[in-house]
Curated annotation (Swiss-Prot):
Disruption phenotype: Flies exhibit more sinuous tracheal branches and uneven lumen with numerous breaks in the dorsal and lateral branches. It comes from Drosophila melanogaster. Residues 337-359 form a propeptide. This is Lachesin. Residues 135-221, 226-317 form the Ig-like C2-type domain. PANTHER family: CTX-RELATED TYPE I TRANSMEMBRANE PROTEIN, LACHESIN. Residues 1-25 form the signal peptide. A lipid is attached at A336 (GPI-anchor amidated alanine). Keywords: Cell adhesion, Cell membrane, Developmental protein, Disulfide bond, Glycoprotein, GPI-anchor, Immunoglobulin domain, Lipoprotein, Membrane, Repeat, Signal. Required for normal tracheal development and maintenance of the trans-epithelial diffusion barrier. Functions as a homophilic cell-adhesion molecule. May play a role in early neuronal differentiation and axon outgrowth. One of its GO terms (biological process) is maintenance of epithelial integrity, open tracheal system. SUPFAM superfamilies: Immunoglobulin. Glycans are attached at N92, N140. Expressed on differentiating neuronal cells from the onset of neurogenesis in both the central and peripheral nervous systems. First detected in the cellularized blastoderm, apart from in the ventral side. Expression persists uniformly in the early ectoderm until the end of gastrulation. From stage 10, expressed in an alternating strong/weak pattern in each segment until stage 15 when it disappears. From stage 11, expressed in subsets of neurons and later subsets of glial cells. From early stage 13, strongly expressed in trachea, hindgut, foregut and the nervous system.
């Protein structure tokens, strides 16, 4: 029976050791572990771990690899001149640990751990750092809208921030949106056929749970033909007393407003005083004061409003009464002579007496 000699055993062991050494020397460096994606707040701390194998003879780098790569470390030496960064190496686990304190918004991005084998051959692993940022509504969002009644309106709202902000639409005073709800979620709010009732202030609200969010006010103007309402279509007043005739006009753009009687346009003079008062939401109150009413001034008056989208008119009838109406005749006295005062006084006394005896 053949038995190996001692010299043969030594030779075999030596060959095995050489084979193992060559095999190990030929092993390609690998990255066995890299920290998973990190999400941090501004001012916080993050640590990236990169574990390597078979890389003792190679250079290991940390880089920030966004548009322009920034070298942070080489081997166990920190390269970046920023006191917020630090680097440690754990030889037991062959792990490089890159730490960033007091995280800033600009620290967000992709970090790469890289083993340099040659100028053309590298082994890399990446980890992404996301930094929570409050929403900021972008300048390319809608600022304001002017549209004709019946046309389509589209409002857009975009915001930066992390996590991605949610965009919610509201109206002033929580009025119902054209979508038939108090709120609408989405970057674009569409009104297929805008009505004058849709005008007003809309709020674009961006929120992602970081800070208090951001808001933009968008003013929507709707162009439409005038609409006139008359609070008191018939008014009575006694002779020689003032009387105010009123009409309310709703229109955009602001209309031209005139008062007429018997197809003759009235103007400010000793008989009439015309005033216009613009209120919010495209309303205008127009008042025609008839000064010391005369017989010929009783009858129909027309309030007419016109803009480039159309026109409207409404009538107000002024009729004669015996007793003065207050307002606007409160405290007003007309003295044309003693005879007039006496006649008026006797007339009023007679009316009051008749009313008393009738009981």
């Amino acid at each position: 029976m053949w038995r190996p000699s001692i010299s043969n055993c030594v030779w075999s062991t030596l060959l095995l050791a050489i084979f193992v050494q060559q095999t190990l020397a030929q092993r390609t460096p690998t990255i066995s572990y890299i920290t998973q994606e990190q999400i941090k707040d501004i001012g916080g701390t993050v640590e990236f771990d990169c574990s390597v194998q078979y890389a003792k003879e190679y250079n290991v780098l940390f880089l920030k690899t966004d548009s322009d790569p920034v070298f942070l470390s080489t081997g166990s030496t920190l390269v970046i001149k920023d006191s917020r960064f630090s680097l440690r190496y754990d030889p037991n686990s062959s792990t490089y640990k890159l730490q960033i304190k007091d995280i800033q918004e600009t620290d967000a991005g992709t970090y790469t751990c890289q083993v340099v084998i040659s100028t053309v051959h590298k082994v890399s692993a990446e980890v992404k750092l996301s930094v929570r940022r409050p929403p900021v509504i972008s300048d390319n969002s809608t600022q304001s809208v002017v549209a004709s009644e019946g046309s389509e309106v589209q409002m857009e709202c975009y915001a930066s921030g992390y996590p991605t902000p949610t965009i919610t639409w509201r109206r002033e005073n929580n009025a119902i949106l054209p979508t038939d709800s108090a709120t609408y979620v989405g970057n674009t709010l569409r009104i297929k056929s805008v009505k004058k009732e849709d005008r007003g202030t809309y709020y674009c609200v961006a929120d992602n749970g970081v800070s208090k969010g951001d808001r933009r006010n968008i003013n929507v103007e709707v162009e439409f033909a005038p609409v006139i309402t008359v609070p008191r279509p018939r008014l009575g007043q006694a002779l020689q007393y003032d009387m105010d005739l009123e009409c309310h006009i709703e229109a955009y753009p602001p209309p031209a407003i005139v008062w007429t009687k018997d197809d003759i346009q009235l103007a400010n003079n000793q008989h009439y005083s015309i005033s216009h008062f613009a209120t919010a939401d495209e309303y205008t109150d127009s008042t025609l004061r008839v000064i010391t009413v005369e017989k010929r001034q009783y009858g129909d008056y027309v309030c007419k409003a016109t803009n480039r989208f159309g026109e409207a008119e409404a009538r107000v009838n002024l009729f004669e009464t015996i007793i003065p109406v207050c307002p606007p005749a409160c405290g007003q006295a007309y003295i044309a002579g003693a005879e007039d005062v006496s006649a008026t006084s006797f007339a009023l006394v007679g009316i009051l007496a008749a009313l008393l005896f009738a009981r």
